[in-house]
A protein has these predicted regions:
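Conserved small-residue
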Residues: 1-564, 583-585, 599, 604-787
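Short active-site loop/helix that positions an aromatic residue
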Residues: 564-566, 577-592
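Duplex nucleic acid-engaging cores and interfaces of nucleic-acid transaction enzymes
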Residues: 574
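Catalytic core segments in nucleotide and nucleic-acid processing enzymes
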Residues: 594-596
Length: 787
């Protein structure tokens, strides 16, 4: 499921750096253009007139402009001048043409990027792929969808709009010849005709699955996944009967019909997006990407499992059925990776696993890695304001609040006062400074180093005031299903297996040698009191977990509703585990998961009309950020309406699914409050949590988040920097080498002056280039576009 929007590309890089010996992902550039760039001169003039006109004439001019745009015939064009900037001589003649870096974005390599004929090693500009913003010009989008687009006289065709792009009104174009040469790879042998002959597909899902080729990924050297040693098996589902808070929806009327706590039979897709591999295949758990293939795979020795005499009274059998019902012997076929049907998104459109493998080989495809699990936890993690705002305000007394902030305050104090901490911060991400500080510790009093320290403190302080608090012995990790239970179902045929992890327990090897008994399980987005208090496995169960689960993934039970409470899949979703006593003690009592029946995605034939409807409808119904902020404003008010936030949480999740379902419930009686809260100013702590202006925020309230914001400021705002001592200044003369006397009138000195002059000229050229790169980075949005 979709989580909070994060910079996935930066995480992508960090996680590959952490796994030793792997090739790093390469960065590339592409153009990101807009439908406005396709305007004719007449359309542009009408648009300018529309923007400048008064309110009375505005509707008339809008209709004239829109009618003119809709009547365009032929293929729209974006000429070369939209892609480049120009310098002219005094006579108006072009003397220099340069790429317009303001129109470019930076991405990391992906499956599609590797299909291009470009060298990806040099931060290349890739012209085979272009991103476009619809900018609410839906008529132009339809024209491009039906007819393509000419960019610098090259024809481009619509490729897809990923889930993220659909919400933002964007889509992907590819150069026509590039598409024709690679369409079998993009679709791994499928065509729209094949899909339609087999009943069609939900348009939103179809677009998202096509977009998998654009997900950031690498094929790691030395870790090729052999498709012939892989197998696709059915999904493993169980049903759990537990108490839930039901939000009833009348799907025909699209209305909320009631709410109440009761016991329900809840279906749990235990392996939703997850598979497993023998521990020798990859160095750690990983998210995978390939055409139509997406999810996470986790290490588990299923051969060792098969070697047991019996499990729950049954001898494991290596002969199993794949997703199509065909028989396989896992041992004889040397199977090393087992995928589940939920990972191969279009599996029903292939006739068999052999059919998929045939297309895979014919198109010379590879299973790539999107991200490896973190194998070196830092030993601490930071909270989100969402985790804090849902704690009980009555339980979070001033004393408890001080306890919660203590580690963060200590860290901020160390930045200001402790020399070793200062040096560590000053040298972080800069090896040259680190080496210099090792030789001359006094460098910490240099003005440049001090400016870095002051900036670092302000950033960390602002983060803390935005409720990003340090939690010791806490970590983010992948969520892993109980693979022992899965193997018991798969190889022993037991429908509701016991597994290893008991009801209301979790396991993570990070806590094997730590004294904690209980953790809070948290995940973003965290909107309605989604605190999953769980016990850590101990004693005999712990020893069995050590035997079967070796990585730092959090293994969850197959017997409880943690997945419903936190709304996670196991396709690479991450969880925060914290044993923080204050948080656990301040969690509200008697939490039960919210439960509702969502709208079902509807299949249709794949055609341009269906694609147009899916993209435009999603663009016009995106309000996820608004819903989250409305809920935060509700928590920030003294009279928090918890029923309203339950409804908003459900509404938010239905909105997340909108690209697939194309359906949403009406707010009804909750709409008035929704609009009122939407119009309210932001809470004070949003100045630091989201960079909002003071003028757009309220005064400090008594909410959890605002109280922490105020407390952090009072505890750290008045302390002086320990390194801002007028008597402690860095003397650069200690860097001088006095062994060799210098004669400024000597011939050698004049030669050195000439060398220095040449170097200064080179420095100016380099500085200019660096400014261009910085300018590009500042204007570039590094977006994962991971479906």
């Amino acid at each position: 499921m979709n989580g909070e929007v994060v910079n996935e590309h930066l995480l992508f890089v960090e996680n590959f750096v952490e796994v030793e010996g792997l090739n790093k992902p390469r960065r590339i550039r592409i153009y990101k253009l807009s439908t406005f760039d396709t305007f004719t001169e007449e359309e542009r003039a009408l648009n300018e007139a529309y923007k400048k006109t008064g309110i009375k004439e505005r509707a008339t001019l809008k209709k004239i402009r829109d009618d003119k745009i809709a009547s365009y015939e032929g293929i729209r064009k974006i000429d070369r001048k939209k892609l480049y900037t120009y310098e002219y001589d005094k006579d108006g003649k072009v003397i220099k043409e340069s790429e317009d870096i303001n129109r470019q974005i930076t991405l990391f390599e992906s499956e599609m990027m590797r299909y291009t004929e470009n060298n990806l090693d040099g931060f290349s500009l890739i012209m085979d792929i272009v991103y476009m913003k619809i900018a609410y010009q839906t008529s132009i989008f339809k024209q491009i969808l039906d007819r393509g687009l000419l960019i610098d006289d090259e024809q481009y065709v619509f490729f897809t709009s990923t889930t993220h792009q659909m919400k933002n009104g964007e889509f992907v174009l590819v150069q026509k010849d590039f598409y024709n040469d690679n369409q079998n790879k993009f679709m791994c042998g499928l065509t729209d005709d094949i899909i339609n002959q087999k009943g069609g597909c939900n348009s939103g899902k179809y677009l998202a699955y096509k977009g998998l080729t654009l997900s950031s990924s690498i094929v790691p050297d030395g870790y090729e996944i052999d498709i012939d040693k892989c197998l696709l098996v059915p999904d493993f589902n169980t049903t759990t009967n537990e108490k839930v808070e039901c939000i009833d929806i009348d799907h025909e009327k699209r209305e909320f019909a009631g709410m109440g706590i009761r016991k329900e039979d809840v279906k749990i897709p235990q392996m939703d997006g997850a598979g497993m591999f023998l521990p020798s295949v990859l160095p750690a758990s990983a998210q995978i990407r390939c055409s139509h293939l997406k999810g996470a795979i986790f290490p588990f020795d299923f051969r060792k499992f098969l070697g047991q005499d019996e499990v729950e009274g049954v001898r494991p059998n290596p002969i199993i059925k794949d997703a199509w019902g065909n028989i396989h012997d896992v041992i004889k076929e040397d199977i090393q990776v087992i995928f589940t049907a939920s990972q191969l998104k279009m599996w029903k459109y292939y006739n068999s696993w052999d059919d998929y493998k045939k297309a895979f080989h014919e198109n010379r495809m590879h299973i790539a890695i999107n991200k490896f699990a973190d194998t070196e936890p830092k030993g601490y993690a930071k909270t989100s304001y969402q985790f804090i705002q849902t704690l009980s305000s009555e339980k979070l007394t001033d004393e408890k609040l001080a306890e919660l902030c203590a580690d963060t305050i200590e860290y901020l104090d160390r930045i200001k006062t402790d020399l070793d901490t200062m040096i560590k911060i000053a040298s972080k991400d800069d090896d040259y400074i680190s080496l210099a500080l090792e030789v001359h510790k006094e460098l910490v009093y240099d003005e440049y180093i001090q400016s870095k320290l002051e900036s670092k403190f302000k950033r960390e302080s602002n983060d803390a005031r935005g409720n990003k608090l340090i939690l010791k012995d806490s970590l983010y990790s992948y969520i892993c299903p109980d693979l022992y239970a899965f193997c018991t179902w798969l190889f022993c045929g037991i429908e509701n297996p016991q597994g290893i992890i008991p009801h209301n327990y979790v396991y993570n090897s990070f806590y094997n040698d730590k004294p904690y008994e209980v953790v809070d399980c948290l995940r973003s987005p965290h909107l309605y009191v989604e605190h999953g208090i769980r016990k850590l496995v101990k004693n005999d169960v712990l020893e069995k977990c050590k035997e079967w689960f070796n990585d730092l993934d959090t293994v969850v039970s197959s017997h409880d509703l943690l997945c419903r409470l936190l709304m996670f899949d196991v396709d690479g979703d991450e969880i925060l585990l914290t044993p923080n006593k204050t948080i656990i003690e301040c969690v509200p009592d008697d939490i039960v998961p919210l439960y509702y029946v969502p709208f079902e995605p509807v299949k249709s034939d794949i055609n341009n009309d269906a694609i147009y409807q899916a993209v435009v409808s999603c663009m016009e119904n995106t309000q996820i950020g608004d819903i989250s902020n409305v809920m935060t404003k509700n928590y920030n008010n003294a009279d928090t309406d918890m029923e309203f936030n339950k409804i908003m949480c459900c509404y938010n999740n239905l909105s997340i699914d909108y690209p697939k379902t194309q359906d949403i419930v009406k707010l009804g009686k909750y709409e008035e409050k929704y609009n009122a809260l939407k119009g309210e100013n932001n809470p004070q702590f949003f100045i630091y949590a989201k960079g909002k202006s003071k003028g757009s925020c309220k005064a400090l309230s008594k909410s959890n988040a605002d109280r922490i914001c105020d407390y952090i400021h009072k505890q750290t705002g008045n302390k002086k920097y320990g390194w801002q001592d007028s008597e402690k200044k860095f003397n650069p003369s200690i860097l001088f080498n006095n062994e060799n006397p210098v004669t400024i009138n000597s011939e050698k000195y004049h030669e050195l002056e000439k060398v220095m002059f040449t170097l200064r000229m080179k420095e100016q050229v380099l500085a200019s280039t660096i400014k261009d790169v910085i300018k590009l980075k500042l204007r570039t949005r590094i977006s994962a576009y991971a479906p």
